[in-house]
Design a protein with these regions (language model features):
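Radical SAM/AdoMet-radical enzyme domain recognition
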Residues: 1-87
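Auxiliary Fe-S-binding modules of radical SAM enzymes
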Residues: 71, 78-79, 89-227
């Protein structure tokens, strides 16, 4: 919400891209999801940022909450050069008992209202998103199918949490502490950090277990994990 008023300062500080979480373009729905009537401020930030740097808009579709949101959100990419990405709900924390909406269903809802979305011919980035283009659109739509499109074999991610820990995988509770080293003034700090990073890479699991929820060991919510 504060991006618009701070954008110039962030650009001067070196910001070269931004991700914005937005689960709906409907004002009442936005207020129900976030508890705040601030959709217009968020949209103002999207429009302003889209003219100055690469923007990714991230949406999580929840069954019974915002199932009608994908097409209006995708439509933002018609006139704005943004990537609108749909991320499957990962069943961790409070979401463990929620039903994930498959991205195949999300794509179907978009194509039903807007038209065929062709695979983007451009090179894939280093992340898990798969992009498509809608005819006449300035931007793209993307899909991160964390549950139904398992991409663990090519995952190159570690997550630095809000409490200074490295998580190899969001599905499991395993984490490697970094905070005490970061706050330490020892001369060998850099080497110790490197060792912890390598440890996190070594314990990275071969695959998540979102299809067998009893095996999920991460009980914290995404808002607490951060990163």
């Amino acid at each position: 919400m504060l991006l618009a008023e701070h954008l110039d300062g962030l650009l001067e500080a070196g910001l070269d891209a931004v991700n914005i979480s937005l689960d709906t373009t409907d004002r009442e729905q936005y207020q129900a999801i976030t508890g705040m009537d601030e959709l217009e401020r968020v949209m103002a930030s999207v429009r302003l940022a889209a003219g100055k740097l690469p923007v990714k808009i991230n949406c999580v579709v929840q069954r019974g909450v915002n199932e009608d949101a994908p097409a209006p959100l995708a439509a933002l990419a018609r006139d704005l050069p943004v990537d609108v990405r749909f991320i499957e709900l990962m069943p961790i924390g409070a979401a463990k008992d929620m039903q994930t909406v498959p991205n195949a269903e999300v794509l179907g809802r978009i194509e039903e209202r807007i038209g065929k979305a062709e695979e983007d011919p451009g090179p894939r980035g280093s992340g898990p998103a798969v992009y498509r283009r809608l005819k006449g659109f300035s931007g793209r739509i993307g899909f991160i199918s964390a549950v139904h499109g398992q991409f663990c074999g090519t995952c190159n991610r570690l997550r630095l949490t809000s409490t200074g820990e490295l998580k190899p995988c969001l599905c499991y509770g395993d984490r490697v502490p970094l905070r005490e080293i970061l706050r330490d003034g020892a001369e060998d700090k850099a080497e110790r950090i490197r060792e912890r990073i390598l440890e996190a890479v070594r314990i990275k699991p071969a695959a998540h277990c979102f299809d067998d929820r009893e095996k999920i060991t991460e009980n914290r919510e995404m808002a607490r994990i951060g990163g």
